[in-house]
Swiss-Prot record:
Predominant location: endoplasmic reticulum
Subunit description: Interacts with the DNA-binding domain of p53/TP53.
Described function: May play a role in cell survival and cell growth. May suppress the transcriptional activity of p53/TP53.
Keywords for this protein: Endoplasmic reticulum, Growth regulation, Membrane, Mitochondrion, Mitochondrion outer membrane, Phosphoprotein, Transmembrane, Transmembrane helix
Cross-referenced SUPFAM superfamilies: ARM repeat
Transmembrane segments: 7-29
Gene3D superfamilies in the record: Leucine-rich Repeat Variant
Annotated protein name in UniProt: Armadillo repeat-containing protein 10
Pfam families found in the cross-reference section: Arm_2 (PF04826)
Species in which this protein is naturally found: Mus musculus (Mouse)
Residues with PTM Phosphothreonine: 48
Keyword hit for Endoplasmic reticulum: yes
Length: 306
């Protein structure tokens, strides 16, 4: 009898347990509508699922930020940063993430020794930086990003992510002064990098070259003479046109300030000596006969300055 009673209690327990599990299941799945179950409320980790393409709402972003701040799991951290970065591409979410205190949470991740996590954090900050109000909070990371860009592996994804963020942060003149001490390093990177790195560095330098307040600093920087190879006719147009625009912008800024390049004293070996020297003049004359119309026009616009 005792054995039968025990078996009966076990059976009852299994039935009750199954019933409780079913209740929890129904609570999380929600009531049926037309024979179909509602999708359950997603947990923070569910929101990092790569297949989740919806734009997150404020409550979901809050969960995601909490997860990002609290987890030590590198896989979850990386997924959370990717999801956050994707959502930061939308203007509404750029403001929401800032208001939720998300920028410092993301910003702290650029200190990660994990290069992939660091890259994803920089990408997220890059998308967030499109919002002007966000830039006031992101600016504190600019000096570190400048240092890291020069220390990161050459032509790496993390280096390009840092350069993209710096490019976004220098679209206006507000924070360009934060890069004043990094100009020489940018020119060095321009000469060492591959095509993708060269293009991204040139985009950044073009932003700086449009600001008259940065002109003297650009012209005074010491640059290797191999810089002039960027003005060779066989250079890819995406690089050549940007290099020509850089020169054109500097000329325009000098004109705006009512100064001629030769009126400003610069040391030998500076960008000034390269741009306004005879070798560069010869290259401009050669480019004035270039087969590409855009290259030809820019070269002709620069040529009269010699």
């Amino acid at each position: 009898m005792g054995g039968a009673r025990d078996v009966g209690w076990v059976a009852a327990g299994l039935v009750l347990g199954a019933g409780a599990c079913y209740c929890i299941y129904r609570l999380t799945r929600g009531p049926r509508r037309g024979g179909r179950r509602l999708r359950p409320s997603r947990s923070a980790e569910d929101l990092t699922d790569g297949s989740y393409d919806d734009i997150l709402n404020a409550e979901q972003l809050k969960k995601l930020l909490y997860l990002l701040e609290s987890t030590d799991d590198p896989v979850i951290t990386e997924k959370a940063l990717v999801t956050l970065g994707n959502n930061a591409a939308f203007s509404t979410n750029q403001a929401i993430i800032r208001e939720l205190g998300g920028i410092p949470i993301v910003g702290n991740k650029i200190n990660s020794l994990n290069q992939s996590i660091k890259e994803k954090a920089l990408n997220a900050l890059n998308n967030l930086s499109v919002n002007v109000e966000n830039q006031t909070k992101i600016k504190i990371y600019v000096p570190q990003v400048c240092e890291d860009v020069f220390a990161d592996p050459l032509n790496s994804a993390v280096q390009l992510a840092g350069l993209r963020l710096l490019t976004n942060m220098t679209v206006t003149n507000d924070y360009q002064h934060l890069l004043s001490g990094s100009v020489a390093g940018l020119f060095h990177l321009l000469l060492l990098g591959n095509g993708s790195t060269k293009v991204q560095v040139l985009k950044l330098l073009l932003n700086l070259s449009e600001n008259p307040a940065m002109t003297e600093g650009l012209l005074s920087v010491q640059v290797d003479s191999s810089f002039l190879s960027l003005y060779d006719g066989q250079v890819a147009n995406e690089i050549l046109l940007r290099a020509l625009t850089l020169f054109q912008n500097i000329n325009n800024c000098l004109k705006v300030e009512g100064r001629l390049a030769n009126q400003i004293p610069f040391a030998k070996g500076s960008l000034f000596f390269l741009l306004y020297g005879e070798e560069c003049a010869q290259k401009m004359r050669a480019l004035a006969c270039h087969h590409d119309v855009d290259v030809k026009e820019k070269a002709l616009a620069i040529k009269p300055k010699f």
